[in-house]
Amino acid sequence: MKHLVLLLLTLGFLNNIQAQKPSDKIIGIWLNEDKTNKIEIYKTNDTYSGKVVWISEMESNPNLHPKDKNNPNPQLRSRSILGMDIITGMQYSNGKWANGTIYAPKKGMYADCKLELLSNGQLKIIVSKSGFTKTQIWTRK
């Protein structure tokens, strides 16, 4: 009986792993390229967003709560960066996530964003603004 229960639990676990949609493979926590922030990517309905869940500066100073002081909207400058959505509106199509926006709190800048899951499991972030493109590689945590 114990073996049967163990077998059923194992099969259920393996089924869940295989059942994960390709579009959901980016869901999880990612460390940004300069290792200063962890971003949790999550799904709401059919779009993906990413919020800041860890800021390296807070390790040495737990009382520090960085604010969005460079936001172009003065009414948002007092909001905390921790917990803030910095990636919004990502839509999955043909192995990539596109049509989203990324916000850089340190610069107070919004830009177009695309995401691509690389074969090594890293996440390629492609940011475009005014004809310029920058790429970052994030690592899953």
Q: Whereabouts are the PLM-identified features?
A:
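Short, exposed beta-strand-loop hairpins at the edges of beta-sheets
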Residues: 105-107, 112-116, 122-134
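N-terminal helix-cap/turn-to-beta initiation motif at the start of protein domains
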Residues: 18-29, 133
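Short Pro/Gly-enriched beta-strand edge/turn motifs at strand-loop
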Residues: 20-24, 69-73, 94-97
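Short, solvent-exposed coil/turn segments at beta-strand boundaries
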Residues: 43-47, 93-96, 116-123
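Bacterial Sec-dependent N-terminal signal peptides
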Residues: 1-22
